[in-house]
Amino acid sequence: MDKMLLLLGVSILLSEVFAQTDLTGKVFVFPRESESDYVKLIPRLEKPLENFTLCFRTYTDLSRPHSLFSYNTKNKDNELLIYKERMGEYGLYIENLGAIVRGVEEFASPVHFCTSWESSSGIAEFWVNGIPWVKKGLKKGYTVKTQPSIILGQEQDNYGGGFDKSQSFVGEMGDLNMWDSVLTPEEIKSVYEGSWLEANILDWRTLNYEMSGYAVIRPRCVALSSYNKIS
C-alpha cells in the first residue's frame, strides 16, 4: 500500500511538472522577477527551419528589457530569440544577429505579437495587436537549427540555463503557437482575433511543456476584446 501511494504521489507530481495539455483560455503566469522560474516547451520539430511564424499574447507591466521566447541549441546561443528591448521596441534574433522593430504601444496593456521569417529572402515581418510593423531583413539563406531548448520566462545564455533575473519575464503569456511556414496577413489577423489555426511546431491546444520554479497556470482574465481596443 505504501509503495502504491508513493507511486501515485510521484505520478501526480510529474503530471504537474511535465504535461501535454489543451491550454485554451489559460495563461502561464510568471509572478515575480527571478532566475529560477520558467517553462520549457517541447516542440514537434524534425528538420531545420527555413521559414516560421510565431504568435503569442502577453500582459506585463515591465518597463525594463526582457525575454519573451528563448530558443537555444547546444552549439548556438540565441539561435532564435524574441526580446522586448523597451516599450514599443522588439528584437528578433537569429543566430545572434538581431533585427529591431519599433512602433506605438501603450504601457501595461495586453499585447498580441506575431513575427515571421523567410530564409529565401531573409525578410522578417512583425505584427502587434493585428497591426503590421516595419519589415526587416536578416540571415538570408540561413536555416534555424533543430534540437532546441525553448524557454519562456528567462533568456538562456547557454543550453537550458545561464539565466539572469534582470532579463526575466514577469506577467502572463498565452496562446503561443509556432508554424514552419510564413502565415498570410489574413491568417495573422484571424489568429489575432482569436481563431484557431492548427500549428505544427508548437500548438497551444496540444502543448508539451515542463514547469520549473514559481510558474503557474491560470485562466486568462484579459478578454480578447481588450487586444482589439488598443490596436
Curated annotation (Swiss-Prot):
Q: Which cofactor does it need?
A: Ca(2+)
Q: Name one GO biological process term.
A: innate immune response
* Glycosites: N51
Q: What InterPro entries does the database record attribute to this sequence?
A: ConA-like_dom_sf, Pentaxin_CS, Pentraxin-related, Pentraxin_domain
Which named protein is this?
Female protein
Q: Which family does it belong to?
A: Belongs to the pentraxin family.
- SUBUNIT field: Homopentamer. Pentraxin (or pentaxin) have a discoid arrangement of 5 non-covalently bound subunits.
Pfam families membership: Pentaxin
Cysteine-cysteine disulfides:
C55-C114
Look up the further comments and give them: Plasma concentration of FP are altered by sex steroids and by stimuli that elicit an acute phase response.
Kindly list the GO molecular function terms attached to this UniProt entry. complement component C1q complex binding; metal ion binding
Species the sequence originates in: Nothocricetulus migratorius
Which segments of the protein form a coiled coil according to its record? none
Binding of Ca(2+) 1, residues: D77, N78, E155, Q156, D157
Supply the CDD domains for this chain. Answer: PTX (cd00152)
User: Where does the record say this protein resides?
Assistant: Secreted
- The entry's keywords: Acute phase, Calcium, Disulfide bond, Glycoprotein, Metal-binding, Secreted, Signal
Cofactor remark from the record: Binds 2 calcium ions per subunit.
Say yes or no: keyword Secreted present. yes
For the ligand (Ca(2+) 2), the binding residues are E155, D157, Q167
